Amino acid sequence: MNFGSLSQLFYDSLAISAWKSYQGTKWALRVNPSSGNLHPTESYLISGPLEGLADLPTISHYSPLKHSLEIRANFSDKVWKKMVEGLPSDTIFIGLSSIYWRESWKYGLRAFRYCHHDLGHALAAINLSCACLGWRSTLVDYLSTKDLEIILGLDQVNKDEIEVADCLIAIVPNKDKSVLKLNKQIVSDDFLNLN
């Protein structure tokens, strides 16, 4: 795992793929599909120390516009070791969230359904990107929405653009076919005061 391969993961799954324009209006197209090209899904990287990014474990937001990671918070090695206990040391996590108003202004009540549809597209794109890199991904399915909001720092963010935490994916950059045994002791309390 290095900064270049991590960049490739995001580039192949969630990045801007092209720009279109028509009669003076310009808009981006992305690698992952989205209903109405509205892209309500946001992504966050949780990683240990990574050369080129940070010397400490971090939570970063992925910006498709800049194809860059925006560090939101650092946390201790102790918390990181607890998070990856029983997993390979180069494991990373990607958290996904939805911003419902990006769909609701156009689709009304159907926005909830379309946001989850787009979440599925993002999950599939990440999984395909991992497979192309020879990596494995698995859903961390035992965290509550509230726990995930705390871990991603979404419980303390601007209330004008509410993000709802959707899921967390563990990514292991190796071809080991053994079953991933995720540490069920990821405790959101460790992340409460990061932001």
Where are these regions (language model features)?
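Acidic, surface-exposed loops and disordered segments
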Residues: 1-195
